[in-house]
Regions:
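Domain-scale detector for complete catalytic domains at protein termini or as standalone homologs
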Residues: 1-89, 96-271
């Protein structure tokens, strides 16, 4: 399997025969936040997604247009998926980016994900709830990072490192600000995950995700704040793994054919 720049941690191993789980990170993160999950590929092939200008793609110009980014990522994912099964996971900004990309894969490539899991993200029809806008500049962003938590204090105290990171994070916010819902609805189930102590994304801002699918919707709560997916240990990943592997195996294109036949709709509710 050829390694694409968008998927830096994919190895040509037996995992390539498993159901793929494409993982989209939060604003300010990178594909590396999901690298710990790649150690546990007994049932899933974990595919962290790297954006332009990030970590392993640092030599590239950061993306700032969400719609263009969705188109680019969908093309790369389609090449990798081919006719295999896949599912999508997105945290915070990554939930909306992953949703839009999955919707384009379904509508333009005929590739329907097995499941979409969105974590720590308000539903698409609501305006962003962030206290920060990319036009406010770097100092305002530092204030927002302190308010949010999740950023190590030693990083916030390192001015040289901040000067390198802040433009990347602002680019992420610009991506998020340009990701607009344009009527997309997935034909696969959507599961929404929330942290019990997440004041940024309370349950009432999440339930609207049920309107983004013509299939089943499920809402689950987990211990932790906005960054609950990245708490130490494997408990959350194992729960996620169970969800992603719960449905019967069919290829992405086969599910697209099934979704166009009303008599086959019941398969979407088999859990």
């Amino acid at each position: 399997m050829e390694r694409l720049t968008e998927f830096p941690f994919v190895e040509d191993t037996g995992a390539s025969r498993l159901r793929m789980m494409f993982c989209f990170h939060h604003a300010g993160g990178s594909a590396a936040v999901f690298r710990p999950w790649t150690k546990y590929q007994e049932r899933l092939m974990v595919v962290p997604v790297e954006l332009p200008g990030k970590a392993t793609r640092i030599s590239e110009k950061p993306a700032t247009d969400g719609e263009q980014l969705v188109s680019s990522l969908a093309g790369a994912m389609a090449e990798m998926i081919n006719d295999q099964e896949y599912c999508v996971y997105g945290h915070s900004m990554g939930a909306m980016l992953g949703f839009k990309t999955a919707a384009l894969l379904e509508s333009e490539y005929g590739m329907v994900p097995r499941l979409m899991v969105v974590a720590g993200r308000h539903e698409p029809l609501r305006s962003p709830v962030s206290h920060f806008h990319s036009s406010q500049g770097e100092e305002a962003l530092v204030t927002e990072l302190v308010r949010l938590g999740g950023t190590p204090a030693e990083l916030l105290a390192d001015r040289e490192l901040l000067d390198w990171l802040l433009p990347q994070i602002i680019a992420d916010y610009r991506i998020d600000e340009t990701l607009v819902h344009r009527g997309e609805i997935l034909s696969c189930p959507i599961h929404a995950h929330v942290g019990c102590e997440d004041t940024e994304t309370p349950v009432e801002l999440v339930v609207g995700w049920q309107a983004m699918t013509s299939a089943q919707f499920e809402l689950r709560s987990f211990e932790g704040d906005h960054f609950f997916p990245h708490q130490p240990g494997t408990a959350y990943y194992r729960e996620l793994e169970e969800e992603m592997c719960a449905n019967p195996r069919t290829s992405a294109r086969q599910r697209h054919r099934q979704s166009n036949h009303p008599g086959d709709v019941e398969e979407k509710d088999e859990r």
